[in-house]
Amino acid sequence: MFCVPLCAELHEGVAILRQFQDKAEPLVYGHAKVSVTSLMAAMAADIVSALGKKCILVLDAYFAVAPVFAILQQVQDDGCQRLLHIVTRAKSNVVAYQDPPLKSAMPGRPRKYGTKIRLIQVFEAKAEHFEQTIIELYGKPKSLCFLCLDLIWKPLGKKVRFVLVADGSERFILMCSDLTLSAPDIILAYSYRFKIEVSFKVLKHLMGSFFYRFWTHAWPRIGKQTTSDLSHAAEDVRKIRLISQTANAIEAFANFGCIATGILQIISLNFYQTIWSKYPGWLRTIMDPEI
C-alpha cells in the first residue's frame, strides 16, 4: 500500500501571498480563516469534492482543532450525504463532555454540556472497561486494548468518537468525526498515517520535488534587518505579478514531483515482476516483491 501524493501547496505564512495568487480563503462558520490547519482542510475538501467519493482523512494531533472538523463537515454529495470524515490523534490534554441532563422544571437556561471528562485520566479510572483486540498493524498482528466513547467536544459543539488506546505502556487517544466507524477500524486507519512520512522521504530525497530554485527580486530577502512581510508589494502591480508567478512556479514544481511519484507507484504496483526481472543491480537482501 502506498500513500499517493495528490496535491502540494504553500501553506506557511501565505495570507497575503494567496491574495496575490487570487486564491480563495477557507471559510469557518462563515468567516475567512487562513492558517496551516484550515488551508490543509480546505485543500482536502476540494480534492474529495472533485472525486465525489467517501473518504477518511488521517492526520496527526496538530490538526485536532475545531476549524478542521468544521471545514470537512461541509463536504457533501448531491444528496446532502457527508463525504469526508477525519481520524486524528487527540492532544494529551483533551477534555470532552457527557450529554447534558434532561431539562428540569427549575427556572434558568438548560445546560448545554454534562459532566466534564479529562480523557487522559480515563485510562486509570476505567481500566476494567477496556476491550482487547488483535489488529494487523504495519503488516503484523498486534494486541491492543481500547475504550470507545462518544462525547461532546466543546470546540466543535458536537459529538466526536474518542478511542482510548493502550498499546503496552504507550497511551494515546484518537478522535473521529464518524460516529458509525468502529474503534478497531479507527485504529487501523490511523496506523496508515506513517505512510505519509515514507512518501515525503521519496518526494524529497529520491524525486527532488522540493529542490526548486525560483526567486524574484520583488520578494524581500530574509536577513537580520529585513522581513518577509509582503504588504509592501500590495500597491505595486508589477511586484504582485512577479511574486505570484514565483509562488505558482514553486507549487507547480512540487506538484510535478507528486505526479511523477504517483506514476512510479502505479508502475511498481502493476509491473513489479517485470521490474525485478529486468533489474541489473545486486541487493544484499531481496524481499518478496509481493509484500
Residue positions per predicted region:
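Single, function-defining residue in the core of a domain
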Residues: 2-291
